[in-house]
Regions:
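Long, charged, low-complexity intrinsically disordered regions
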Residues: 1-51, 55-56, 62-64, 76, ...
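A generic structural motif
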Residues: 66-71
Length: 95
């Protein structure tokens, strides 16, 4: 898997640590399909982070309203992947 320096960014460099609050939650959309939503990611790198998470999970997804939406329930492994991307464990909330 790619390391943070291989994909060319460290999200915490762009944000103050007190403001780098990432919220992960599971929602059910059309036809009760699960969607994992991720809020609080740096907007300048949103597309790059979304692309990397979709690749790592082998899932479809999109960016909508400043959130990353991943098809399926990925809460079990998402925290580990966000930590690998450089986010602090203290600033990741799983709802």
């Amino acid at each position: 898997m790619a390391k943070p320096d291989e994909i060319g960014f460290n999200p915490l460099e762009e944000l103050d640590r007190s403001e780098a609050r990432v919220v992960v939650r599971l929602e059910f959309r059309r036809f009760r399909k699960p969607v994992t939503t991720i809020q609080g990611l740096p907007s300048g790198r949103l597309a790059e982070i979304a692309r990397e998470l979709k690749r790592r999970f082998g899932a479809g997804g999109t960016i909508k309203g400043g959130e990353v939406l991943l098809q399926g329930d990925h809460r079990g492994h998402l925290k580990e992947e966000l930590i690998k991307l450089g986010f602090s464990t203290d600033h990741i909330d799983m709802i």
